[in-house]
Regions:
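PRPP-associated nucleotide enzymes
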Residues: 2-192
């Protein structure tokens, strides 16, 4: 796992503006891809030779790009499912998780790998773990692209973490600011 702290020098990456906010370069696509490679290697090692078909649960919308990149690297049979939860309004977490779109597959007796874009306070992943237990999942692992350990308040274990970051608001590679910026190949941090 790599820990990222804000740096001011990035070659080829410029500031961007989304609505009335300015974001500056934070993590390059090259670093993101390397981190995904490392996480995929760990997941593949843990699931090598599995005889069941684990469910890869993509948490919409933020983890779509991370999930797609991770799936391309997995070497075992798996099934893709989605769920959509919401806990953000603008740049702030509300602390309240809403289920916007329910599970798309029956999880009773199944092993599940939750794929998240970012874990910060841990409220959403805690609520999701409860939802999956109620749905009958036999085992739940959590894989996140980004983790903010400085503000994490949950006891949930994060099994696979690609990168640790500061508790700052970011966009890009699936993460958004009011639904904008998901398509950016790099990750940017709010210029405060």
């Amino acid at each position: 796992m790599i820990k990222f702290v804000f740096q001011t020098q990035f070659s080829g990456m410029a500031k961007i503006k989304l609505q009335n906010r300015t974001f500056v370069p934070y993590i390059s696509n090259e670093e993101i891809e390397k981190a995904i490679d490392r996480v995929a290697d760990k997941v593949n090692a843990d699931y090598a030779g599995c005889t069941d078909v684990p469910v890869i649960l993509c948490v919409l919308n933020g983890s779509i790009i991370f999930t797609a990149e991770l799936l391309k690297r997995l070497t075992f049979n798996c099934e893709l499912a989605t769920i959509r939860l919401s806990s953000y309004q603008g740049t702030e977490t509300t602390g309240v998780t809403r289920k916007v779109l329910g599970l798309t597959v029956n999880l009773k007796g199944r092993r599940v790998i939750v794929v998240e874009d970012i874990v910060d306070t841990g409220h959403t992943i805690t609520d999701l773990t409860r939802i999956l237990a109620e749905a009958g999942a036999s085992d739940v692992k959590v894989c996140t692209m980004l983790f903010k350990p400085a503000i994490f308040k949950s006891t949930i274990k994060l099994d696979y973490v690609a990168m640790e970051i500061e508790p700052k608001f970011i966009v890009g590679f699936g993460l958004d600011f009011n639904e904008l910026g998901r398509n950016l190949k790099d990750i940017y941090i709010l210029d405060e």
